[in-house]
Amino acid sequence: MRLGLDLAHLENPIANSPGLIDVKPRLRYLRDAATSIAASWFSLCGLSVGLPVEPAVYDLLVAMPDGIKRVQVKTTTCYAKDGWTVVVGRRPYSVGNRERRVPYDPELIDWFFIVDGNLTIYLIPSRVIAGRISILLRTYTKYIVGNAAGLMAGQLAVA
């Protein structure tokens, strides 16, 4: 109290919230966060984004200047001696999801939005990787469109 005034309501409620400082982004949640990262990136580009209401082969619909585009979102935290490897294939719908992976049909997907373990963002036309089930991202550096590493608050929290 100062001058008889209660100033408690002016305190920072976040700073006084128990447990909030223990919340840290972790790469193990990248797969869960990737669609939101993609939607945010497209929105920051001034494009409208939609999510499919029913299960679809794509994760996002994006209104681009040349029409609605279907975007499949992929992530990788698999770093090998040659660089980041990402699976760009899918499993056909089956009981137990045990079928072998198959490539996406480039007639059904227009773009792949890929986020690697460094949070580097790639936007790759589906026709460029058509027929492949996995790719080595270092061969696609010309498709890098950004980086979301700032979400990690200056450090990567592994595991």
Where do the language-model regions lie?
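Acidic-basic catalytic patches of nuclease active cores, encompassing PD-(D/E)XK
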Residues: 7-51
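Loop/turn residues immediately N-terminal
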Residues: 56-58, 119-120
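Non-catalytic C-terminal interaction segments of nucleic acid-processing enzymes
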Residues: 119, 124-159
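Conserved catalytic cores of phosphodiester-cleaving nucleases, focusing on short active-site segments
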Residues: 42, 60-62, 67-75
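Active-site metal-binding core of divalent-cation-utilizing nuclease and nuclease-like domains
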Residues: 48-56, 63-65
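Nuclease-adjacent, charged terminal/linker segments that flank catalytic cores
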Residues: 1-4
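Catalytic cores of nucleic-acid endonucleases
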Residues: 74-121
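Short alpha-helical elements
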Residues: 18-20, 24, 67-71, 105, ...
